[in-house]
């Protein structure tokens, strides 16, 4: 296969609606306000702390930051589906449309890698223990208890992820929180955040 430079690598994403040159970290929260506050804290610290085994389904002893390798349309569809589950089946709140996006090659340089979807015990047999943070359980053997997160196309960064504002884009769910985010930056004299970030994506504009 012919070597591919970055220009041609990016061209592939341009012509494929199912691919993205960016990966997205969605902030969690039981409410929209909590998820928004978590996003603000990440921006103020310029750091995403890794989830641990006790708090975020991470295998092994190494914390990891979780991101999704999916285009915005797919992320928007996943968010809509999760909202439907919460309303119809009283599922636990996972994500509410707040997040932060990075160029994939930036994450790669931070030692971010795609996760490995497999049965946990099987994956532990062929991965060294210091790579167990990459394991995400996949089990389709029981029709009554399917475990499948492959739709998230997850990447993980071991430890924590530090960044500069110029390396990220912000995601908010709607115009209300777009205005609230801008107001926060102005009220707190953090215009530098607004001026340096690569952009702000309003998920509601992706839906319709």
Predicted segments with their positions:
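NAD-dependent ADP-ribosyltransferases
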Residues: 1-208
């Amino acid at each position: 296969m012919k070597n591919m430079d970055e220009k041609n690598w990016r061209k592939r994403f341009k012509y494929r609606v199912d691919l993205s040159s960016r990966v997205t970290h969605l902030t969690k929260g039981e409410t929209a306000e909590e998820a928004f506050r978590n996003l603000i804290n990440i921006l103020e610290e310029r750091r995403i702390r890794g989830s641990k085994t006790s708090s975020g389904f991470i295998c092994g002893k190494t914390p990891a930051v979780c991101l999704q390798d999916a285009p915005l349309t797919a992320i928007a569809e996943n968010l809509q589906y999760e909202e439907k589950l919460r309303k119809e089946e009283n599922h636990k709140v996972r994500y509410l449309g707040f997040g932060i996006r990075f160029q994939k090659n930036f994450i790669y340089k931070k030692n971010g890698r795609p996760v490995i979807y497999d049965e946990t015990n099987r994956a532990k047999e062929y991965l060294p223990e210091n790579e167990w943070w990459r394991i995400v359980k996949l089990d389709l053997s029981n029709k009554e208890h399917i475990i499948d997160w492959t739709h998230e196309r997850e990447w993980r960064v071991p430890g924590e992820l530090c960044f500069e504002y110029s390396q990220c884009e912000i995601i908010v769910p709607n115009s209300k929180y777009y205005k609230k985010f801008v107001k926060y930056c102005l009220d707190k004299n953090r215009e530098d955040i607004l001026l340096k970030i690569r952009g702000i994506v309003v998920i509601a504009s992706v839906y319709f």
